[in-house]
Amino acid sequence: MTSHPRDTPQFYLTAPSPCPYLPGQEERKVFTHLVGRRARDLNEILTQGGFRRSQTIAYRPACETCRACVSVRVVVEDFAITGSQRRILQRNAELIGTPEPNRPASEQYALFRRYLDARHGDGGMVDMTVLDYAMMIEDSHVDTHLVVYRERGPDSAIHGRGVGAPVAVCLTDVLADGLSMVYSFYDPDEASRSLGTYMILDHIRRARALGLPYLYLGYWVDGSRKMDYKAKFKPQERLMPQGWVRVE
């Protein structure tokens, strides 16, 4: 039997399953485990090559007849905010996002459950238990943290933190060339605040403050209404067969 060192990545292919984005299509994924001493370096390389992280798994689409999933990353330094995006920032001026260790909490899970039930009731994550949520948040061998958004309080100017229950949460990886928004969720009763867009705008600001050139948004799927929002942050780069291509 051939043995493989723990630090040598092995890649696997999933069986076909229904595509969650395009009706009538099937999806397959290639994946590997992010474990061992080289997990962080491997995650950096794979993210730049179009992979996404979920817990200790890095994956990317490997569909036989479709190439609709396209990795996108915002060019932070050149990002041109639109009028509607500026209004979203103003609408959420009383929110404070605080970086916190990637530790799960009951108030996070309560918000996560409400978000799934309201926004993704027919999705693959809808049956996630509190244990599943805890694993999603803390099961990581790479540099990751939570950004937890709460309302501004009377003493927020002193301690720099919001108060009350979370309004929105983002699990964020820190890479050598950018931030990667792994998963985000928010209060579904606050839909008028466009909190998903707000978190992206806030992460663009965070990446710029850290001197990082990119914000990785995951996959954009042309023709999928679920993914349309990712095309609104420009300039951005999209990973094509010839490499990353800038889109203005």
UniProtKB/Swiss-Prot annotation:
Record GO cellular component, one term: cytoplasm
Lineage: Bacteria, Pseudomonadati, Pseudomonadota, Alphaproteobacteria, Hyphomicrobiales
Entry-linked SUPFAM superfamilies: Acyl-CoA N-acyltransferases (Nat)
Its EC number(s): 2.3.2.29
Annotated source species: Methylorubrum extorquens (strain CM4 / NCIMB 13688) (Methylobacterium extorquens)
Reactions this protein catalyses: N-terminal L-glutamyl-[protein] + L-leucyl-tRNA(Leu) = N-terminal L-leucyl-L-glutamyl-[protein] + tRNA(Leu) + H(+); N-terminal L-aspartyl-[protein] + L-leucyl-tRNA(Leu) = N-terminal L-leucyl-L-aspartyl-[protein] + tRNA(Leu) + H(+)
Function, as annotated: Functions in the N-end rule pathway of protein degradation where it conjugates Leu from its aminoacyl-tRNA to the N-termini of proteins containing an N-terminal aspartate or glutamate.
Main subcellular localisation: cytoplasm
Keyword check for Transcription regulation: no
One Pfam family of this chain: ATE_C
GO MF annotation terms: arginyl-tRNA--protein transferase activity; leucyl-tRNA--protein transferase activity
GO biological process, one term: ubiquitin-dependent protein catabolic process via the N-end rule pathway
This protein's name: Aspartate/glutamate leucyltransferase
Annotated localization: Cytoplasm
Top EC class, one word: transferase
Stored NCBIfam families: PRK01305.1-1, PRK01305.1-3, PRK01305.1-4, PRK01305.2-3
Family listed: Belongs to the R-transferase family. Bpt subfamily.
